[in-house]
Design a protein with these regions (language model features):
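A substrate-engagement module of RecA-like helicase motors
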Residues: 2-11, 56-331, 337-340, 387, ...
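SF2 helicase catalytic motif II
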Residues: 352-383
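N-terminal pre-P-loop "Q-motif" helix
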Residues: 11-28
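Conserved helicase motor "Helicase C" RecA-like lobe of SF1/SF2 P-loop NTPases
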Residues: 677-708
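Walker A/P-loop
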Residues: 30-48, 168, 174, 199
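Conserved RecA-like P-loop NTPase helicase motor core
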Residues: 633-652, 705-827
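A contiguous, basic/glycine-rich beta-loop/short-helix subdomain that forms a polymer-engagement track
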Residues: 305-329, 340-349, 468-636, 714-745
Length: 868
């Protein structure tokens, strides 16, 4: 495939790795949309690096050779024309003119490619000179900077509180007359439209996963052959302690941009500032020694921490330096939102056109896009924003232009209409009771009509809010003047979501409680300091194509707890631009089945041609005899396992589950990880097992751990879990960890070797079928994909979650583990399991059969280990 058989690799690759790289190379060469599955532990990241970077460098040489060949062909044609029209000067010149123009164009493209190579050489020379101390003013500049910083530190030592960091002047707060053609970009750099060589954008969910990629790249043969640029947020890159102290992302972005504006003031502006009683400063790290930092980034592979450390030494901003490095970078590392969110992508200067996009850990890509573009706003958000807006208009009414007054009035009108949907008025307080408000579901066009905002041009209003930086100015106003007549805090009780969801099902429903918690957690994350940020995001959803989303109106028991939620139903609508512009796209993951989801709901729905889509799936590197999978249909006393909604609180079933765990703990060595369907069910089970004494019996063999509720406690629990296994003293043989499907431990964590000798999945974690959001999603798929798409989505939601849990074990070729699926329904779902699990999967109608199979498996492994 692609005519390539050999790939540079740090060691002899496994056959499946070579196969992966060949298929990846072909995908990029042919400009395809690839879905690649390689089980975790098979060296997927290294295969991606070596396959993709070989293609990247080959393509660069191919591009240059094709330009030279095309130029040579044209020059040959010109010679032939001269011979053909010898003596006829006019005819020869006429034909040659077009060809000469083509030659000039080809030469310009070739020169542009050479120019980048020359720039990298110059960067290397600059880094060398800098490191050797040959830049004349280096010490003087650093000493000058230190003196300046010491003076600033001394002056500000008495005023270090976060709330006093940002010194806003009234001139900063007043809305200016907007130029319709003004450029809203943060950067003033002139981007050359030269021929650019192809870049690879590598995208993953978290910065830790991107750091892992960098670690693998450093071990690869391409460590010194490519320029890599890791992109991150200001939160990760900012080295200005005053800005970082703000913690909140919106506030950090706001203050950073304000400091940039102050550093770009004209002489006229400076005279005005000097007359002001309020002090103003620009960021001391801008522009700084950016050229050297850019050179450092582009000439050596560095992760985020390395770049931050170097930038602190150079006293220059790493955030803006990495952004400026994108132009000459070959491999650009970006988190999900920087690529998948169009506004973020454009603000960073990321251009996907004719470039390659590789998205790793893409198994939840559809859900990630939906979450990224789904927005909730609370009654408290609306009331506080309305309150800030009213105060702001009153404060500056004498200096606001007529246009600005009009737009502010339109925004105020919208906010009043939105709070009306939640049973409030502009004079309401968050803890007031709502009046005449009901739970409702709307299409986008219906919502605007029902909310009575259909007469407002939402596009113009959002453009005004964005270009005028109104949210920043309201935040600045609140910081300086405080919220006079500030809205009262809502009641602590959060019943807005619960009342809505409980009306759908019994009040004691564990699934409903999980759904309530999910919505409450989402809303709690919204920052109240400047609520217009999230309200603007909500208003932007109204620009979505009507059929692609729904809006839920959910009044609370108090107005502040009610919420409006936009749910994106069609993630392809935010991926279509990428599909159209990118040269090739690769979605990679450990468990990508069912691949039909990505084909139907992402690529085809985004307008891709079917023939452009390719798939690749490889087996696990772990030998067949190192994996055992049992579908357990009943327990020790014959009670059938079916953990559906009706049976989940069945005490006989809970007792049987407890007896099963006791028996399995007796025969399985080291670590066991148990995945349960939900947090509420985990609590129910643990309480029941404590009450009937079964938990104590489990504790005789295994030290018991539970998934922590706080993410900050995860590492501590895992460390203790690991220590308990390593230091187990008889009669104990290890530890057992109770976890939750889709929780903090079901993705991204490894339970290799003794940490995960058995993964047990209890029940089938179907999403709550009573959820209105789920119902709307299924209905949308049925109407827009095919008649079975909704029910298939429901089934896939369950099995994808199960497969993620299974993938936590068996992380390298010499590892071994077992998987026990506790529910009789799994017998009919075997084809939805990963291929490497299917090959050893057996259905065990009776408990004794499973016990014997597990006992034989571990006896064989014990014997094998003792013989080594």
């Amino acid at each position: 495939m692609g005519g390539v058989e050999e790939f540079p690799f740090p060691f002899e690759p496994y056959p499946i790795q070579s196969d992966f790289m060949r298929n990846l190379y072909a995908c990029l060469e042919q400009g395809n949309l690839g879905i690649f599955e390689s089980p975790t532990g098979t060296g997927k990241t290294l295969s991606i690096i070596c396959g993709a970077l070989k293609w990247l460098l080959d393509n660069k040489e191919k591009q240059k050779n094709e330009l030279l060949k095309s130029k040579a062909d044209l020059e040959l044609q010109i010679k032939e024309i001269k011979k053909k029209h010898e003596g006829d000067w006019f005819s020869a010149q006429t034909e040659q003119m077009t060809l000469n123009m083509e030659i000039v164009s080809l030469q310009q493209k070739f020169d542009a490619l050479l120019k980048r190579e020359e720039k990298i050489k110059n960067y290397k020379q600059k880094v060398k000179q800098y490191n050797e101390g040959k830049i004349e003013n280096k010490k003087r500049d650093v000493n000058k900077w230190k003196t300046k910083r010491e003076n600033e530190t001394e002056n500000s030592r008495l005023d270090e509180k976060v709330e006093n960091i940002d010194d806003f002047m009234d001139t900063d707060l007043i809305l200016q007359e907007l130029d319709k053609h003004s450029n809203d970009s943060e950067d003033d750099d002139d981007n050359e439209s030269n021929e650019q060589e192809c870049k690879i954008y590598f995208c993953s969910r978290t910065h830790s996963q991107l750091s892992q990629f960098i670690g693998e790249l450093k071990k690869s043969p391409y460590n010194d052959k490519v320029s890599l640029v890791p992109i991150a947020s200001r939160n990760n890159y900012c080295i200005n302690s005053k800005v970082k102290a703000l913690k909140n992302m919106n506030l950090i972005n706001d203050l950073c941009q304000q400091l940039q504006r102050k550093s770009k003031t004209t002489s006229k502006d400076e005279k005005t500032i000097k007359k002001s009683k309020t002090k103003t400063t620009s960021c001391p790290y801008m522009p700084g020694n950016q050229e050297i930092l850019i050179a450092e980034i582009l000439t050596e592979i560095r992760d985020i921490e390395d770049i931050v450390k170097t930038s602190e030494e150079l006293k220059t901003c790493p955030y803006y330096s990495t952004r400026k490095s994108i132009e000459d970078g070959q491999v650009i590392l970006v988190p999900y939102n920087s690529i998948l969110h169009k506004n973020t992508r454009e603000s960073l200067g990321i251009d996907i056109k004719n470039n390659v996009l590789i998205i790793d850990e893409a198994h939840n890509l559809l859900e990630a896009i939906e979450r990224m573009h789904s927005v909730s706003i609370t009654g408290k958000h609306i009331l506080q924003s309305l309150n800030q807006l009213t105060q702001y208009q009153e404060k500056f009414k004498s200096v606001l232009t007529a246009k600005n007054v009009l737009h502010l009035s339109q925004l105020s009108f919208c906010l009043k209409k939105l709070i009306k949907l939640l049973g409030g008025t502009s004079k309401s307080l968050p803890n007031d009771k709502p009046k005449n408000a009901d739970n409702k579901l709307f299409g986008l066009d219906e919502f605007e009509i029902s909310a009575e905002i259909d007469t407002i041009n939402i596009f113009d209003l959002i453009e005004f809010i964005t270009k005028s930086k109104l949210a920043h100015k309201l935040r600045g106003y609140a910081e300086k003047y405080g919220n006079e007549n500030i809205v009262a805090e809502p009641c602590k009780e959060k019943k807005g979501v619960s009342e809505f969801l409980k009306s759908l099902q019994k009040k004691d429903s564990p699934e409903i409680k999980e759904n309530i918690k999910q919505h409450e957690d989402e809303i709690d994350k919204d920052q109240i300091t400047s609520p217009l940020f999230v309200i603007t995001s909500f208003l932007e959803t109204l620009k979505t194509k009507c059929s692609d989303g729904r809006i839920f109106v959910v009044p609370g028991t108090v107005i502040g707890d009610g919420y409006l939620r936009f749910l994106l139903l069609n993630p392809a609508s935010h991926f279509s631009d990428i599909v159209k512009e990118a040269r090739a796209i690769v979605l990679a993951g450990g468990t990508m089945e069912p691949m039909s989801e990505f084909k139907d709901q992402l690529f085809l729905s985004a307008g891709a041609k079917p023939e452009r889509i390719m798939t690749f799936s490889c087996d696990h590197i772990v030998p067949k005899e190192n994996i055992l999978t049992c579908i357990l249909q009943s327990g020790p006393t014959g009670v059938e396992f079916e953990f559906n909604y009706q049976n989940r609180q069945n005490t006989k079933l809970l007792d049987e589950l407890g007896r099963t765990l006791v028996n399995l703990c007796n025969i399985i060595p080291a670590g066991i990880v148990v995945f349960l369907p939900s947090y509420s069910y985990e609590e129910l089970l643990i309480k029941h097992l404590e009450t009937n004494g079964i938990l104590a019996k489990i504790g005789l063999k295994k030290t018991i751990f539970r998934e922590p509720k706080s993410s900050t406690q995860v590492n501590l629990v895992l460390e203790n879990f690991s220590d308990s296994i390593k230091k187990a003293v008889k009669p104990k043989t290890g530890a057992i960890l109770f976890s939750v499907v889709g929780g903090k431990l079901s993705e991204g964590l490894n339970f290799s070797d003794d940490l995960g000798r058995c993964v047990i999945v209890v029940g089938m974690p179907y999403p709550n079928i009573k959820s209105l959001e789920l119902q709307e999603k299924m209905k949308y798929l049925k109407e827009n994909v095919n008649s079975n798409a909704g029910s298939i989505f429901y089934e896939n939601s369950c099995m994808k979650a199960v497969n993620q849990c299974i993938g936590r074990a068996v992380r390298h070729i010499n590892d071994y583990s077992t998987v026990v699926l506790l529910d009789r329904r799994y017998a009919n779902k075997q084809k939805a399991l990963p291929g490497w699990i299917q090959r050893t999967c057996s259905v065990q109608p009776k408990f004794s059969g499973a016990v014997q199979a597990l006992a034989r498996f571990f006896a064989a492994k014990k014997k094998q280990t003792s013989n080594q």
